[in-house]
Amino acid sequence: MRRFATPLLIGYVLGVLALTIPPDFSPDPTDYLGESAWTPLQLVPFAVDAPSFLLNVVMFVPFGVLLPVCVPRVGSFWRVLACSVAASLSIETAQLIINLTLDGLRTVDVNDLVANAVGGVLGFGLLRLARPGPPSRP
């Protein structure tokens, strides 16, 4: 199974990076003048619209499924959670650097971190349901 999961994980990671890392430049600079809807930093937990939160959860479900298949030593709840948080934090940090250097109009959001972690552990839960076995040790 790992033989098929590894290319899927690589493609998945490349897709997530393509969606989250490139600067989001507005085609019209006046879009962000005056009353701006863009917030560069969102540090208030759970102050987010439900669709955005849900999409971030869904985006990380494959991570929680594929990572433990490709890297068996990551096959515990706590390790998948830690890897999900680390991956999400890496994305948010890259977005912050892009904002500071390129004016990339990306929002660095603590809610994305929470949603991505939830998605990762949900994916791991789905994997455990699909492949029952003895619980992994942390």
Over which residues does each language-model region extend?
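Alpha-helical transmembrane segments that form the membrane-embedded catalytic/substrate-binding core
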Residues: 106-127
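Bulky hydrophobic segments
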Residues: 1-105, 124-138
